[in-house]
Amino acid sequence: LNLGTAGVMYVGGITGVIGAFIYEQNATQMNTFLTILIPILSSILGSLVMGLIYSFLTVTLRANQNVTGLALTTFGVGFGNFFGGSLIKLTNSDVPSVTLTATSLAFKKSLPFASKLGWFGEIFLSYSFLAYVAIAIAIIVSFYFNRTRSGLNLRAVGENPATADAAGINVGKYKYISICLGSIIAGFGGLYYVMDYACGVWSNNAFGDRGWLAIALVIFAIWRPNLSIIGSILFGGLFIVHNYIPNLSMSDQELFKMTPYLVTIIVLIVISMLKKREFQPPLSLGLSYFREDR
């Protein structure tokens, strides 16, 4: 469980913003394909570096995973605020934010026929392509974990790395690859937040606690990617339900924003009471592997 996910999302978001900012400032004529591609590649690069840092510290140096993750989050937030503040100064804006309208419009394009399908198109087909990419990733990862040899090997590494190592599985390689790919996916989450949810506006500390919400979602989904689709819809609904309740004070709104975390705590209590193995996290979750202790 990478507690640095919030920081990785931050870095993925700001590096995507930097790529988009450079392109918007230098392009004489905006190309839709490049407008989307450059921020994505920038986000991949930034989040991949974060994944490599976490992998090196926790897999190679065997540092404490929880402490390393928290440090990575602190670093990621500071990195984002520093470079975000630098971009804000470059724009000479009167407000403390950077707005990338052209890039946001390219990312937010929905299917052209969605509006013609009534309520169905409005509910299911009116989102940007990254939303559907996220769903596809969850389905593919679920299939990979349960139906492929390498996916089963990865699960074995998470359950008992010593046994996996004895069976000839390269534990370090599997951990490095999975951490880096997971970081890239988290970076996409940060990019999606900025370009779609925030309409291309970057302001420091804008992510709030959404990175931690992603970590809570992993626990809620009981480490099953397919359940994370349902969980993300539920968490998203709980997080914004206060917008549809009239006459709520600011303090009451913050209480409603707590509900996803309360639900996660309830899920943890329930699965601990059930004591069924299929509902439990991987046995080696958060533990460093020392081959000489095998």
Segments from the language model and where they lie:
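Membrane-interface helix caps of multi-pass small-molecule transporters
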Residues: 18, 22, 49-52, 56-61, ...
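Cytosolic-side transmembrane-helix boundaries in multi-pass membrane proteins
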Residues: 159-162, 166, 171-173, 245-294
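Hydrophobic core segments of alpha-helical transmembrane domains in multi-pass membrane transport
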Residues: 13-19, 74-81, 131-143, 182-190, ...
